[in-house]
Every structure is written in C-alpha cells, then in structure tokens.
A protein has these predicted regions:
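Short, compositionally stereotyped local motifs that mark structural "simplifiers"
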Residues: 431-521
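Edge beta-strands of extracellular beta-sandwich domains
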Residues: 507-516, 592-603, 619, 696-703
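Conserved structural position at the C-terminal beta-strand
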Residues: 501, 588, 689-691
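Aromatic-rich carbohydrate-binding modules that target alpha-glucans
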Residues: 474-484, 529-577, 590-597
C-alpha cells in the first residue's frame, strides 16, 4: 500500500506534468498531453445536486484521487435559474455560488484535490450566456482591473432575441455555428468577446485553480476560436463536446489546430451497438482499411491522443441513448483501450470496487492514451486484444465463449466475469493511499437537547492536531480551534462542524463536516405571487406522505394563504413542527415547477419562465429573507450618485450586492464602499451590504 509520505512525490510529479517547463508551442501543446496515463471521472450526472456538492467531493477527495487524475465538474458560476446544472451561465468572475455549493466550498474542493495530485476540469460554457434579469442584460464584472460591460453588440444578430418585441436587438455578426435557443449566442468574431473569454479562462485557471476545460456545445461556434482561447490560457487539458460522427469530430480537431481533444462519440455509439446486438465484432474498425483496431477516434493513431473515451455522460444517460449492456464489462473494455478514459459518475458509484480494480490494472500495465493495440480475435461472440503499456502488456477478452491466450495461464488472470477476462504478467499495484483522516462520532442529524461529538484523527503523523470550526469557515493550521484527537465537542444549537488533521503548518487530510440540529425547526416557504390564476403547493418528505402535509396531487390551493412583505405579495406555508426538511412543487393544476428538494429553514422563491409544462425557480432568500444582526438604517446609508452606488458605514464594507426587484443579482463588489451601476436601467433595486464584523443591512435604493 502507498504510504502518506508518497503524496508529496505524487503531487510534485503531477504538477510537473500539468505545468511543464517553458518551451515553444509544439503541435498539441495546448490540447491534451501525449502518452498520457491518466484516467478521468465525470463527477456528476444530470440533477446530481447531492452527489456533486463541492463539500461532498472534497470529503471524497482522498479516495477519488487514488484512482482519478482528472475530475470534470459542472460550470461553477451562478446561473439564471436555481437549481441549475450550469448550462445557463450568467456570472463569469464575481459570483461562483451555484447549485453545487458556495465559492468558498468550490475553492476548498479544488485546493484539496490539487494537494492530492488530481486536477479539476471546469465545464466551460462560452457558446452562450444569459442576462441577469432580461434576455440581454449581462452583468458588469471586473477582473484584474479590467471592467467587462457587454451589450447587444456581443450577441449574434440571428439569435432568437432579435424577434422578441420587448428586448434589445442584437447587433453582433452572424453566428459561426449552431444556434442554442436557451440563452444568447455570443459573437465570437468580436475581439471584445474574445478578450472577455480569455480573461474568464485566466480566472478559472489562475484564480480558482482549474487545470483545464471541457468546452460545452462547441458546435455552436467556429473551431478556430478554441485555438485562440486555449493558446491564450495555455490550457494543458482541453476537450470539446462535438456530438457527431468520426469525420466531423476529426475535422473539428483539425480546425482547432489540434489545440483540443474531443469526446469520442463514435466509441460510445459502437459500444452501444455491440452490446445491444451482442455482436462484438462491432467493437472493431479497420485502420486505413487493413489493420483491426478498437472502434472510434482511437482506431487511428493520429487521433488517439485527442480522444476522450466514455460509456455515458449526463446527456447520453437517457432511454434513447444510454448504454444498456453490462457496465462492468464496458468499463473493462474502455480501460483496456487507448484514448483517455472518462468514467461516468453513476457507473462509478454503482460499480466502485470493479472499476477500482480495472483502473489499477490499467495503471500497473502503464496503458496510455497512445498505447498500441493488436486485435487477436474479432467475431460476433468476442473481441480479444493485446494492449502494450509502458510496463508490459495485457490480454483482454470481451464477450462470450472461452479463450486461452498463448503464454498465459489461469494464474495470470487479474480480472474476470462471465463476459470479460484480463490476463497480464505485470504485478498489479494497490492504489489505495493511507492518509490521515478525521472522523466525527455523530452523523449529521437532529439531536433534541444537544449532542456531544468526539473528533478523532487516524493515520496521523506524530504530533498532529485536529483543527475545527463552527462558523462555516475552512479549518486550517491558522484558522479554527486546535485540539488533540479524542476531543469531545458539545453542541447545543444548530451547528455545522468542519474539521481537518493538521501537521505542523500543513493540512494533511480532507475536510470532514456535519450539521447538527438540537431542536425542531419547521420549514416556512414563501412564493412570490406569479401570473397563475391558481397556485397550489404540493409537498412531501422522508417522514411525511403528501396526504399528511398539503394533500394528494395537486396539493393545496393557496389562495387564502397570502401575506404582504416589503410591498410584495407572497404565498406562505409552514410545515408541522416536526417536519424540518421538505420537498415541494408549485403548480396551477396544469403547469408545474421542477421538484424543489431538501428545503430547510425559511426560504423565498420566485418562478422563472415556463418551459413546456414545467419551470424552474430562483431562490431569493438572500434578498428577502430575515437576516440576523441587521443593522439599523441609521448606521448604514446607501445612495446612488449618478453611475455609482455609494455606501456609508461605520466600519469596512466586506461586500455589496445589488438585486433587481425580481430577485436577480445585477451587481456585486467586495471590500469597496461603492459599486458601478452605469449599466443598469433606472428604477428600484434591492441592496444587501455586509460589514467586516458580519453585520448585514438591506433595503431599497433608487437608480
């Protein structure tokens, strides 16, 4: 087993691989490394808001980093809806609080993985962008002293907003790719747009700490712009989502100047076809019409380096396109092929032990994205190949029937099932690393009257301590309370505990966190009155059936449950005292919202635009909800002075946020007493000012 001291060596090696040394830009320099031995994980699936919380990924960083060199996560910027998977982005620089966690949690997660030698790939969505409160009012943001203030000139002139009577008309060039009708298509021919995207990618890598990009919907704009962006960002890892066949994908790679890899959709489609028909000859294509090779981009040695293979992803995992065969066998095939394999999160969670073993085999043999393959047998019943890595070779058989490779015995079998077998003479190494961990004696939950939680460190270096916080901040050697292993912490009110193991000045474990409640805290839900003539609330929870809360579908008509707050009409409902977590749907008997899950405390919502028969909601609790320690209006004054909103306060201002009356954030600044409002229309806005001591003031201001 690897020992803890190996971490520093691993991290150093990976850092050198990622950063390299200064040199001329060779072919593929900013694309994907040659002979790359790494394995990637897609760290999310559709609507996987729980599994992909930044805090959850950070807690699992030790285990995940043992097996994966790269993890692809959703776009982390704040989007136009909540919840959102990240594909309707609004903010690039100033707001990375998303459906997956806060910006602080994001930075903690990236830093934790980087310390274990695993890089995080950002889902970069720059084909399109949404406005803050309208279709076209992009936020004004500042990065490295440059202010980016975009208008209709940044939008392709043939975007659908051109046909909207109440919206500004786009004046950019015609789109250089396919249209996306969910947001505004950006004009990539415009150098100001290009400069904004270059700055955004610089922020992702040099500020947040991402190591590369997964470009969403690259069919939406010309491939030549990927070259511009990657050469500016000096991206060592770039992969594009070009959903198409072999010829068009390879054409796209060439048009980027080979500055990006691409997902191997042909690999996925051939895998689907082979397993659905139980015809394993479909796993083979002929290179140059003569040499049998694994099907997909990877069948050509020219493109193996630029191929990221996958079995399913968040988009394909649906009835019409998802892989329906044996997942373990498909992963055995993928992990014994060239290209960089990308394991799907759902497959990982459901087949973890098997996939761990298969990754260990790949890494022990030294298979890379450019390893050579000799197909030994290809029939309807089976696929057999010899794969040569940097440390030796293996034989893999996929399918039915027996096969006895020459020179191998049963003792050389390192993995097998009824539908696959792998032989190798290379010793298979253990990838599990023994790392320090911190455990909490009680799981998150409700403990009426209070609870004692024991903090314990295991596998810790001599003299190590535990650092913990209860104020939501990140524990470290310099932040938090330092205690010895075995310390008992008494909790007598709702508290989130975060803890790490500290050795000297270094954090040497992942963060362990838990939230404890000591009394019943019923949920109160406010919905801003929508245009619907009927509004129903339908709710359920783990402990309550829908019939016990608001009745069976469509729930309770809330016409008699309205309140006026801050000049706004709200529908309001409070759960029974013992129900402190609830799921809810707003509907009018015909149209409805998406499921809003795990609602706690007091929450305020507004409806977004209806799409089909469902719509999303935006959580506006930060704007309208009650805030503890609100300052008197006499202590904090806010006024608009022309194009600037000015705050007068008795101490340093930590942050300023400005919102439209619909709840959309339109401007933000940190550690400043003023904020630019030059790009905002005249009208009433809501402000939220946080002072250095945590005091919060909120109210209305006129622009």
């Amino acid at each position: 087993m690897k020992k803890f001291g190996f971490i520093s060596l691993l991290f150093t090696a990976v850092t050198l691989l990622l950063l390299g040394s200064p040199r001329a830009n060779a072919e593929g320099e900013y694309a994907w490394p040659a002979n790359y031995p790494g394995v990637m994980l897609q760290g999310f699936s559709w609507d996987a808001y729980e599994d992909t919380q930044w805090s959850k990924l950070a807690e699992d960083a030790g285990e995940l980093s043992d097996y994966f060199d790269l993890i692809w996560v959703p776009n982390s910027g704040k989007c136009s809806t909540n919840p959102s998977m990240g594909y309707n982005p609004v903010y690039w620089f100033t707001n990375h609080n998303s459906s997956f966690g806060t910006e602080t949690e994001l930075r903690e997660m990236i830093k934790t993985f980087n310390s274990f030698g695993t890089g995080i790939i950002e889902d970069v969505v720059v084909n399109h962008r949404n406005g803050v409160s309208t279709w076209t009012d992009f936020p004004t943001e500042t990065y490295k002293g440059v202010t980016y203030e975009w208008g209709p000139w940044a939008i392709c002139r043939n975007d659908e907003v051109a046909n909207q009577p109440d919206e500004e008309k786009p004046t950019g060039a015609y789109d250089t790719g396919d249209n996306f009708d969910g947001c505004r298509d950006l004009d990539h021919t415009n150098t100001k747009v290009q400069d904004g995207i270059k700055a955004y990618l610089d922020f992702l890598t040099n500020d947040l700490g991402y190591v590369g990009f997964r470009y969403d919907m690259v069919k939406g704009f010309g491939a030549q712009y990927i070259k511009i962006y990657n050469e500016s960002a000096k991206a060592r890892f770039s992969v594009g989502e070009y959903w198409d066949g072999y010829d068009n994908i390879t054409k796209w790679i060439e048009n980027t100047g080979r500055t990006s890899a691409a997902f191997d959709f042909e690999f996925k489609w051939q895998l689907n076809a082979a397993f659905s028909a139980m015809d394993f000859s479909k796993l083979v294509w002929k290179r140059n019409g003569t040499l049998n090779q694994p099907a997909g981009l990877i069948h050509m040695d020219t493109y193996q380096r630029y191929a990221v293979t996958f079995i399913d992803n968040h988009d394909t995992y649906r009835e019409s396109t998802k892989f329906t065969g044996d997942v373990a066998t498909a992963n055995a095939y993928m992990l014994c092929c060239p290209g960089t394999p990308c394991v799907f999160m759902k497959h990982w969670l459901e087949n973890k032990d098997v996939i761990k073993k298969l990754i260990a085999i790949r890494k022990s043999v030294g298979i890379t994205n450019q390893s050579t393959v000799e197909v030994l047998n290809t029939t309807t019943n089976q696929y057999v190949a010899k794969v040569t890595g940097t440390n030796g070779e293996l034989i893999v058989k996929i399918g039915r029937g027996s096969y006895s490779p020459a020179g191998y015995t049963d003792a050389d079998k390192v993995a097998s099932s009824s539908s696959y077998t792998i032989w190798t003479k290379v010793p298979i190494k253990t990838l599990d690393t023994v790392r320090p961990t911190v455990t909490l004696s009680k799981e998150s939950g409700l403990y009426l009257g209070g609870v004692d939680v024991v903090l314990t460190a295991t596998n810790a270096p001599e003299g190590a301590k535990i650092s913990y916080t209860t104020d939501g901040t990140t524990p470290s050697a310099t932040n938090g309370t330092l205690v010895a292993s075995g310390y008992s912490l008494h909790i007598d009110k709702k508290t989130t505990v975060k803890a790490v193991v500290v050795s000297g000045s270094e954090v040497v474990s992942t963060i362990k966190s838990a939230t404890y409640k000591t009394e019943y805290l019923p949920v109160t839900i406010y919905l801003k009155k929508p245009e619907w003539t009927i509004v129903n609330f339908y709710a359920w929870s783990n402990d309550y059936e829908a019939a016990d809360l608001l009745g069976i579908w469509p729930g309770k008509n809330m016409s008699g449950s309205t309140v006026e707050e801050q000049g706004i009409t709200w529908y309001k409902w409070t759960t029974p005292k013992e129900c402190d977590v609830v799921n809810i749907i707003f509907n009018n008997g015909k149209d409805q919202t998406v499921d809003i899950n795990d609602v706690e405390g007091t929450r305020y919502f507004v409806l977004n635009e209806l799409t089909g028969k469902s719509c999303t909601v935006t959580d506006v609790t930060d704007i309208y909800g009650g805030v503890s320690n609100i300052s008197a209006t006499g202590n904090v004054s806010v006024r608009c002075n022309g194009s600037v909103m000015v705050v007068t306060a008795p101490q340093q201002v930590a942050s300023i946020a400005l919102y439209s009356t619909s709840g959309a954030q339109v401007a933000q600044a940190q550690f400043a007493n003023e904020i630019s409002v030059s790009g905002l229309q005249r009208g009433i806005y809501l402000y939220r000012v946080t002072l250095a001591d945590g005091t919060v003031a909120q109210g209305k201001v006129v622009r």
